[in-house]
A protein has these predicted regions:
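Primarily NTPase-proximal linker/entry elements flanking Walker-type ATP/GTP-binding cores
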Residues: 1-44, 48-52, 61-77, 81-85
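Conserved catalytic-core segment of NTP-binding enzymes
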Residues: 52, 66, 76-85, 92, ...
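Short, surface-exposed alpha-helical segments at coil->helix boundaries
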Residues: 57-58
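Expand to "…catalyze enediolate/carbanion chemistry for C-C bond making/breaking, isomerization
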Residues: 202
Length: 202
């Protein structure tokens, strides 16, 4: 079982994928807020990539403002490349994506940019839904869990992590920016779910 200390080691360019409504934008905003407190607001930026959903850009701007960081919009890969070049002085750039294009996102490459790619899934996601993100042997730098609670049964997530080499990193319990992100280890996740199973038997 693998886990990764994403928050402690986070720098450079990080791109996030996941289904629509999974909570990508709020997770990214929390990451931005957390890291801005450590390295300074001027050193962090959020980029929205190819997300043309109604209200999506407004939400990015709102949450970026609450996190105290700048936000940018890239309509395609070429504009993303230009924006990332302009942001080369930033210590951390977080890239939000359209939930409808997660598999495209995994194969995305930007010349001269080392893009770390992360998958965000909901705690109640089914194993079949998770498998879709690995069906073409996609690899992700880490997996993040949204809508997490200690009472949630996350066996599908655990099974998916056991079958793939994707390390677990952090979890988000709710959309409130002031609720801190949680570092998660696979072993702790398994133990917690085993305890929940035992409690449910009584």
């Amino acid at each position: 079982f693998e886990s990764v200390e994403l928050l402690e080691n986070m720098s450079g360019y990080h791109l996030f994928a996941g289904s629509p409504g999974v909570g990508k934008t709020s997770m990214i905003a929390k990451l931005a807020l957390t890291k801005a407190a450590e390295i300074g607001e001027a050193n962090v930026a959020i980029v929205s990539l190819r997300d043309n959903r109604i209200g999506a850009w407004n939400q990015i701007q709102l949450l970026s403002g609450q996190a105290g960081v700048e936000s940018y919009k890239a309509n395609n890969e070429e504009s993303l490349k230009i924006i990332l070049q302009e942001l080369s002085n930033k210590k951390l750039v977080l890239i939000d994506t359209s939930g409808a294009e997660s598999l495209f996102v995994n194969s995305l490459k930007v010349q001269n940019i080392d893009l770390k790619k992360h998958l965000i899934i909901s705690a109640d996601c089914s194993e079949a839904a998770i498998a879709r993100y690995f069906e073409n042997n996609e690899t992700w730098n880490s997996l993040l869990i949204s809508k997490y609670s200690e009472t949630a049964s996350v066996w599908p997530v655990i099974n998916a992590l056991m079958n793939k080499s994707t390390p677990l990193s952090i979890a988000n319990e709710n959309v409130d920016l002031q609720t801190p992100l949680r570092k998660l280890k696979i072993r702790d996740l398994v133990i917690k779910n085993l305890k929940n199973m035992q409690l449910s038997l009584f």
